[in-house]
Amino acid sequence: MMKYVFVALCLFAVVALATEVEQKESNTRVARLNVGGLVGCVVALVANIVGGLLRVIIGLVVTLSGVLQIVVGTVLGLVATVASLALDVVGSTVGGILNSLLGLGAILSLVEEVLHVLLSQALLTGLVNAIFALPLSLLVALSTLTDALASAACDCGASATGAGSSLAGCIAGPNGLLFTVGAGASV
């Protein structure tokens, strides 16, 4: 029985030493960094940061566009209400008894003002959309460009031993960059 325990301990020691030697070899491979690969990964990191900031700006522009549309709609709704009240008052006092009894002049004026307000609201909403469409499309294009730059700038390795890249691993994703330097160590 002791003989089997001794053999098991020897095998365990051999496996542990082999793993330690392999770990040292992979660390020495990682220690010899290629400057071009490191610069590429730094470019990828910066591109990911810029891409994230651009996404935040895109969200703010979309939010601001929506808020401006709400404000424009509210202001124009208030203008329409005040205009209809003013037309009612003017139509009843100036138009005389016949116009106030029939109310045709005031109704026609009210319909005309409502149509003007609706037209101006549609024009202002279109103007707000047009004003924000170009910067928003430019921001989306810049965000896409930085994502493409981030994925192309850093050559991702296939394994944790550094094969295929200057760093052990470089994973460029939409949520950030993860650098794995050596086996099990993340920076």
Curated annotation (Swiss-Prot):
<keyword id="KW-0732">Signal</keyword>
<feature type="signal peptide">
    <location>
        <begin position="1"/>
        <end position="18"/>
    </location>
</feature>
<dbReference type="Pfam" id="PF03866">
    <property type="entry name" value="HAP"/>
</dbReference>
<dbReference type="GO" id="GO:0016020">
    <property type="term" value="C:membrane"/>
</dbReference>
<protein>
    <recommendedName>
        <fullName>Plasmodium-specific hydrophobic abundant protein</fullName>
    </recommendedName>
</protein>
<keyword id="KW-0472">Membrane</keyword>
<dbReference type="InterPro" id="IPR005566">
    <property type="entry name" value="HAP"/>
</dbReference>
<comment type="similarity">
    <text>To HAP-S protein.</text>
</comment>
